[in-house]
C-alpha cells in the first residue's frame, strides 16, 4: 500500500502463510504512499481493537511546536533510538529540512536542522523520502536536489540521534525530469532499493524508460541498473504502487498515469520487470492521480483502488463515476469493479489501512471537497464514516501515517496550503 498504513500483511510479504496467519502476524506496510514519498510506520504486531466501533481520530495538533508552518512535504521516520515516529518537514520554499523528535505526551521538540549538510546546502530540495538504507535501525534521508533539467540524488545517513550526514558515495546524477523517489525492495534481498520517476523524463537514449532503478548493494551504496531491469515506458507517470500482484511473493509495480492507460509491471522474481498491461489490465482511459492496494475480498490476491480527476465517459459504469477498484481475479489479472459509494468528484489521494482494528481495510480519500473516510466490512462492503470518525478540519493535500503514541495503531499528519493537522487514533 502506497502510504505505509496499517493493514493485514499480504502474501507478498510472508510467503507460505495462510490469510488467517497473516492476520495474526505483522501489521504494517507502506500506501501511502506511498505512494511516492511515503512515511513508513514501524509496527511490529497486529493490533486488534476490543471495540472497533468506538474508533475515531482526535485532533492533537497542540503536540506540535508550531501553530502555523508552511509545508511543502513531510514524512514520519525513526530519527533516534526509540520506537516513536518522529517527523521530518520540508518548508514551503524547499530550502530547509527540519526534524521534530517525538517526546511522547510532551509532544514534539522544536524544529532542529537535519544536520550540518542541510544547513549549508544552497540547492532547493525538490523531494525527499525516508528509509533505513544501511540496515542499522535508523531511517536515512533520500533527497532530490536542483532543477528538473539537472536533478541530483543526495543520501544523508542517520547517526540514530537525529543527525544526518553524507558519505562520499552518497551523491548521484539523475535523468532530467526526475521528480520523485520511492524506497522499496525490488530484488527481494531485504534491502531498500530506490525507484525514481517523473512525468516526462528526457533520456539521452531512444528507449524512454521514464524511470530509474538504483539497486542497494546492502550497505547503502547503490548501482544504477535501469537499463537491465526496466522496460521502455511512455511518459506521463504520476505515481506508483508496489505489491505482489501475481502471487509469486515479490513486489510488482502498478504505474499511475495522467490522461491515459495505467500500467502493470510484473517482477520476474529477481527485480527485472516486464510490461503486462495489455494482457492483465482492462483498457480504461482516465486522468488518474493515485492508487493503493489491499485484499478487499480476502481471497489472497491484492486488489487496487484508483482515484482520478476524471474517467472518459466511455469507461464509466454510471453517471459521475470518478473512482473505481481493480479486482484481482488471480495471477495479477484484473477487472474493473465499480462501487457507487466512492466519491463522484475529482480525487487526488487514497490511503488504505485498518483504522479501526477490525482486520478489514478502510479507505481515506482526499477529494476536491475534502477528506472522506470509508469503513471496510470485507467483501467490497463499505460505509461512509466521515462525520463520525474525523475531526471537522478535512481539507488536506497529502497525508502521512505513523504511530505517535506507540499503541500500534496508525495516527496521521496531514497538510495543505492553508494549514496542517496531527490526528491521533483513539478508541474511547
Question: What are the functions of these language-model segments?
Answer:
Residues 83-87, 137-143, 190-196, 249-253, ...:
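Glycine-aliphatic tripeptides that mark coil-to-beta-strand junctions in extracellular
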Residues 70-81, 124-135, 170, 177-188, ...:
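Beta-propeller blade termini
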